[in-house]
Amino acid sequence: VAAARVVLPAALQGLDRQQMTAAIKSAPLGRVDRKIALLRYVERLPLPDIAAQTHYSRTAIGYRLKSIEKMLSV
């Protein structure tokens, strides 16, 4: 699967993979949102693949990513 073009939130820009994982795990996110953030920003999966793995719709993943971005900047 080709890596998706992912625009990283400001809080994750310039971080390597390990630092990104640590930042996501330390953010105030729930279990599902943490998994979505890791799949999107660390694994760089496209939304349909994340939707398939989490059993949410692609649209729901998009909405959740918007709130995840806000939580990462807290």
Named regions from a protein language model:
Residues 36-37, 49-51, 61:
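Hydrophobic positions on the alpha-helical face of helix-turn-helix-like DNA-binding modules
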Residues 4, 54-74:
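DNA-recognition helix of helix-turn-helix
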Residues 26-45:
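Short amphipathic alpha helix immediately N-terminal
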Residues 2-31:
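Amphipathic alpha-helical segment used for protein-protein interaction
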Residues 10, 40, 51:
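Short, flexible active-site loop motifs that bind/organize anionic cofactors or intermediates
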Residues 1, 49-54:
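Short alpha-helical "recognition helix" segments of helix-turn-helix
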